[in-house]
């Protein structure tokens, strides 16, 4: 039976802590895994803090199996993410069946909370990939995690001035509200359409831990790239989107990112690279990053999309993609002319 966490489940959560698999890479690498704290916060806030926890108890005596699953979802948001499932998969069918029950429950709960899709990130060689497929998830992309260990004497990046960091022919500066048109256009021109169903547009989820920066052409003022930096107690996580015809500026983007993202105290820095951004791996390796993990980003839709082809069929094509992304030049919106609009 699967139930929502309550105070009687505290011993079980403590018992399963460290025995499962994190499925939200950014959260795990920056904030760490805090099952009991998350469960208690969500319990006290009656689920409104977006970290609902569910426990499962099955069988009796020596055949008893206990498990838990944790979800991250802000009520009404389009996407939910699985934070953690425990215990890890084992060769016996009993644990696999427990996982399938939890995954089905998470899908139904996510849909009831307003989410249209449920996302999980798991190691590409993990048995979890096949179990998630059985539960109706599909691989939308592969993601490489690269790691850079900053030396103990690294100088903190500090606060980035509003005018930004000079990176040569470009500057890397904090995102402003007027940049959102260019950022959304950049995202539409770089992320494959199917993947856009799995991840929110950059800049739409800034919070106390996450900050956004744009790489701007100093001469023309065009937005060439967007950098997302999430800092937490245990690490930093970076992700970038760069216009296809601006790949020659990628070196300036990485150099600027390393200057602004250095933490006050030594913590590892991670860069998430989707498969369609493979050209970025070599550049990061030249700057000291090493391959740390290879993951499958898997998605299940909680509602049927009217008029859309099945997501599973489209996802299969993405595993061996031949991307031909149309490029629209990111520019400024034309000024609004009320007189001209009135004549039309």
Predicted regions and their residues:
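Conserved GNAT acetyl-CoA-binding A-motif
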Residues: 110-122, 263-275
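Short, structured motif recognition centered on aromatic/hydrophobic residues
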Residues: 54, 80-83, 103-107, 118, ...
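Amide-forming acyltransferase catalytic core, primarily the GNAT-like/NAT-type
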Residues: 1-62, 66-69, 134-235
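Active-site/acyl-donor-binding loops of N-acyltransferases
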Residues: 123-125, 135-159, 268-344
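Conserved acetyl-CoA-binding loop-helix of GNAT-fold acetyltransferases
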Residues: 92-108, 134, 247-261
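Structural motif
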Residues: 5, 57-59, 69-70, 121-124, ...
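Phosphate/adenylate-binding glycine loop and adjacent helical scaffold
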Residues: 129
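Conserved acetyl-CoA binding element of GNAT-fold acetyltransferases
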Residues: 77-93, 232-247, 251
